[in-house]
């Protein structure tokens, strides 16, 4: 089961306050519902591929309105042949849709979220939960990028949903897609805050656990890469220094060098793997700083370059 599916399963098991039922139902029915007329009666079908969500819609409708509700199961014939669950009711359908602020006067479809429906903060949370159940998805935290989105068919609903999320400082944004619009979150911290707001606390903990391990692994990898780069740089410099010292030895002999340079040259030949700091601690005449060692080695590089190019060699 995907992380998104596990999150939705957790949400369908939450208790909902009486004052919040309409908010959650409104989101679920608005985003997954379809109206039709059968024998001059208005029929509403709410469709989902998630059995737990279908049961929740069925339960909330029965609890809030005590109407006759059917729960149908169909098999998809294309692509993945998953079950499709349809919650169907016609009894008082128009009155229920008006109560849920989906239909207005004169059978006008309300495309934005009603302010009256989400007056209380708990009702705002419930609407967001219903919207996520109806059209939401979230990436597994183990994947390469963090992403949570909720799909809406209408721009007005998408914009009002984005505004609702941002009342909780979630920094949500909107984007037009081919067949609708999405409200989305890209920051890991905001995704965990959203999961907290809608009550998916177990999913939040799992998300955070995976994120912490992933971020720690990335930090370790960055540190290792940095150390490797530094080590490669050190090895490269050491090999260059040894090559230059050997070239000097072949051309004029190390004996021709001043004592200070000759001493460092011999140490570098003998201890090619050590750092400049360690090299400085090996000087017989007394400890030399890292910068002092570096200065002398650069002087040896300079002498080697002068020998290669036929310039006048400066030994001091």
UniProtKB/Swiss-Prot annotation:
Q: Name one GO biological process term.
A: cell division
* Localization, UniProt: Cytoplasm, Nucleoid
Q: Which domain of life is it from?
A: Bacteria
Q: Which PANTHER family match?
A: CELL DIVISION PROTEIN WHIA-RELATED
Q: What induces it?
A: Constitutively expressed throughout the growth phase.
Q: Which family does the UniProt entry place this protein in?
A: Belongs to the WhiA family.
Q: What GO cellular-component annotations does this UniProt entry give? A: cytoplasm; nucleoid
NCBIfam families attached here?
Answer: DNA_bind_WhiA
Summary of the knockout phenotype? Mutant grows slower and cells are longer compared to the wild-type strain. Mutation has a relatively mild effect on the sporulation. Mutant is sensitive to reduced FtsZ concentrations. Deletion of the gene in a zapA mutant background results in very filamentous cells that are blocked in proper Z-ring formation. Mutant shows increased internucleoid distances.
According to its UniProt entry, the function of this protein is described as:
Involved in cell division and chromosome segregation. May influence the activity of FtsZ. Binds DNA, but does not seem to function as a transcription factor.
Note the Gene3D superfamilies from the entry: Homing endonucleases
Question: What is this protein's name?
Answer: Probable cell division protein WhiA
- Native organism: Bacillus subtilis (strain 168)
Q: Name one GO molecular function term.
A: DNA binding
Record-annotated DNA-binding residue ranges: 275-309
The alphabetized UniProt keywords are: Cell cycle, Cell division, Cytoplasm, DNA-binding
């Amino acid at each position: 089961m995907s992380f998104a599916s596990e999150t939705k399963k957790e949400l369908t098991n939450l208790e909902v306050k009486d004052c919040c039922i309409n908010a959650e139902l409104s989101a679920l029915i608005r985003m997954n519902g379809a109206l039709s007329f059968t024998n001059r009666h208005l029929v509403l079908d709410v469709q989902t591929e998630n059995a737990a969500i279908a049961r929740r819609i069925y339960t909330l409708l029965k609890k809030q309105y005590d109407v006759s509700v059917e729960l149908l199961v169909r098999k998809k014939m294309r692509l993945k042949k998953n079950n499709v669950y349809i919650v169907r009711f016609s009894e008082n359908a128009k009155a229920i849709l008006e109560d849920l602020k989906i239909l207005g006067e004169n059978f006008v479809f309300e495309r934005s979220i009603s302010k009256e429906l989400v007056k209380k903060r708990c009702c705002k949370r419930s609407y967001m939960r219903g919207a996520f159940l109806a059209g939401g998805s979230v990436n597994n935290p183990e994947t390469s990028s963090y992403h949570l989105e909720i799909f809406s068919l209408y721009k007005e609903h998408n914009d009002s949903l984005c505004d609702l999320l941002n009342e909780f400082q979630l920094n949500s944004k909107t984007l037009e897609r081919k067949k609708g619009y999405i409200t989305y979150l890209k920051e890991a911290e905001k995704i965990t805050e959203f999961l907290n707001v809608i009550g998916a606390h177990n999913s939040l903990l799992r998300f955070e656990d995976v994120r912490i391990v992933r971020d720690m692994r990335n930090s370790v990898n960055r540190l290792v890469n940095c150390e490797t780069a530094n080590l490669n740089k050190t090895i490269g410099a050491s090999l260059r220094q040894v090559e230059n010292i050997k070239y000097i030895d072949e051309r004029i002999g190390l004996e021709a060098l001043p004592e200070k340079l000759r001493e460092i040259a011999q140490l570098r030949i003998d201890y090619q793997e050590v750092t400049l700091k360690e090299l400085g601690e090996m000087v017989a005449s007394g400890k030399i700083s890292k910068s002092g060692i570096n200065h002398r080695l650069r002087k040896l590089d300079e002498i080697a370059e002068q020998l290669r190019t036929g310039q006048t060699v400066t030994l001091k």
